[in-house]
């Protein structure tokens, strides 16, 4: 009975981990950024450029924000304009700087982002393989497949942990947003570009938790079957 309960919760946590990882992988809201279009101390309305990016795409669109409105709601699907500009995120690794980058720092950023992208792809592959192994293990009660699936879930959790850690380093250091901020403030002293982590970013830690938990449960199941059968 306890073995069946462990398998059930392992499958539940594994499914949640897979779902969260795939949504985080496929959505383009890892980073949310706003950039002022013009500054005016006399008006309460500002034209702002909104940026959001993920693994595949980086998109931006223009909007108007009133003084008491929150910029974050402009990124909600229903509040976005019907058309917006998008480019491949790998080819444009900075959330702002379209054509305004230093070639050396840009090349380094592309390499760093490429490494981050490879880790994310490996994490997605690992969690899909883990799910396949667990599905195959269930009919045969194979301790080897359960342990292999559990190990793959743990590997996926570790890989996505590295993805999250590298993305934080990316935003805080590698993207060199401070230089861009200083450049823009020459024209607009009263405005600082805003950069926030998006909901896609926060899905990844939740997926990591469920993936690691599922992996540990399936390892225990595999060891239990090996010892008692």
Swiss-Prot record:
Residues covered by region (Interaction with ITGB1): 49-59
Signal peptide feature range: 1-26
Cellular compartments per GO CC: plasma membrane
Record: glycosylation sites: 47, 102
GO biological process, one term: negative regulation of myoblast fusion
InterPro entries cross-referenced by the UniProt entry: PMP22/EMP/MP20/Claudin, TMEM182
Alphabetized UniProt keyword annotations: Cell membrane, Glycoprotein, Membrane, Myogenesis, Signal, Transmembrane, Transmembrane helix
Localization: Cell membrane
Cytoplasmic side: 136-153, 222-229
Keyword Iron: no
Extracellular side: 27-114, 175-200
Organism domain of life: Eukaryota
Primary location group: membrane
Residues spanning the membrane: 115-135, 154-174, 201-221
Keyword Glycoprotein among UniProt keywords: yes
Annotated family: Belongs to the TMEM182 family.
Function in brief: Negatively regulates myogenesis and skeletal muscle regeneration via its association with ITGB1. Modulates ITGB1 activation by decreasing ITGB1-LAMB1 interaction and inhibiting ITGB1-mediated intracellular signaling during myogenesis.
Protein name: Transmembrane protein 182
Organism: Homo sapiens (Human)
Gene: TMEM182
